[in-house]
Amino acid sequence: MANFHNRDPLSPAFWDERFEKQFTPWDQGGVPARLRRFVADSPAPLRCLIPGCGSAYELVFMLDHGWDAMAIDFSPAAVAAARAVVGARAGQVVEADFFAWQPAAPLDLIYERAFLCAMPRAMWPQVAARWAQLLAPGAMLVGYFFFDDNAKGPPFGISREQLQALLAPHFDCLADEAVDDSIAVFAGKERWMRWRRRAD
């Protein structure tokens, strides 16, 4: 394993160092099957945000299907990796702080993949509150949620009770499905979930 100087996942330098040393065990190297089906089955293109986008393979897939999708990350090295993957549409990848970024138009969907579990547990209420701020009633929070009780991270796993407590004040869970194509770090511990923003 590579030696790292930065141990604070709330610092962009933490993620820069891992991308620069090519230590990215959370990177699937492609688009997960359940997301492929979700995008293909969507009756119309959606306006979507991918926070903490990493290499942003999903962004390419969404754009290819006509979605108005944007990916953000606060790590310059992650943004560079994502722009290399996205190519000619690199303008859809923005270096930004999720907690400060503002959409140009209302979002239909936020895609969750290894963003919540990248955050220390003390930050989770702020993440959930920001999701709720960015999504109007009826809009969706969709993606993969990592369930584990390991004290160390990232990834920081969540319990079902914790996730329910975080999201139930603002969201209704519409889907909760097993995942059969997880990469090693998430294998057997993640679920595909779809949450709908409820009116406050």
Where are these regions (language model features)?
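Conserved acidic residues
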Residues: 108
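Short catalytic micro-motifs in class I SAM-dependent methyltransferases
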Residues: 114-118
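Class I (Rossmann-like) S-adenosyl-L-methionine-dependent methyltransferase catalytic domain
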Residues: 1-50, 54-105, 119-200
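A conserved beta-strand element that flanks and buttresses the S-adenosyl-L-methionine
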Residues: 111
